[in-house]
Design a protein with these regions (language model features):
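Extended hydrophobic leader/signal-anchor segments used for secretion and membrane insertion
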Residues: 1-147
Length: 147
């Protein structure tokens, strides 16, 4: 029996609910606790800045990260807990857009006020957050060397 890809699933059902893995979308999504809800992206649809998108990263992995820049043919994408921006992700690599998530059995919509506050205070100042995280990582290495 063959495995169904995310693209095939979204094409067939239109929506995907899936448990995330990894720490790249902390604090929004925590592995083992939360599930995300993604809808298929329309053929000619352009995602917006701050959308969380599911995209295919060659050769065979899928990533759920946030759009931080929209260009004519590509996106720059960053995980909420990451310091490295993935640049020039082709628009056709994006297969879905997060419409919400489920935490402890409760559904949260991506267009809710609470979610928009999270985007305002956590996501929009991403350049400052990246700088602070890099400083923290550098200091941590220095402190470890002293021990």
């Amino acid at each position: 029996m063959s495995k169904t890809t995310y693209e095939e699933y979204l094409k067939r059902y239109g929506t995907l609910i899936y448990k995330n893995t990894g720490t790249s979308m902390l604090p929004l999504l925590k592995q083992g606790r939360d599930a995300f809800i993604v809808r298929a992206v329309g053929e000619y649809e352009t995602c917006k800045k701050w959308d969380v998108v599911l995209y295919k990263r060659p050769p065979e992995s899928y990533v759920l990260h946030r759009v931080v820049r929209v260009d004519d043919n590509s996106y720059d994408i960053l995980g909420d807990n990451c310091i490295g921006i993935e640049r020039n992700i082709a628009k056709d690599a994006v297969i879905g857009v997060m419409t919400g998530f489920i935490r402890n059995g409760k559904k949260y919509e991506a267009d809710s006020r609470l979610y928009k506050l999270y985007v305002l205070f956590w996501c929009k100042p991403y350049r400052i957050r990246i700088l602070m995280k890099k400083i923290w990582l550098k200091c941590s290495r220095i402190w470890r060397r002293k021990d």
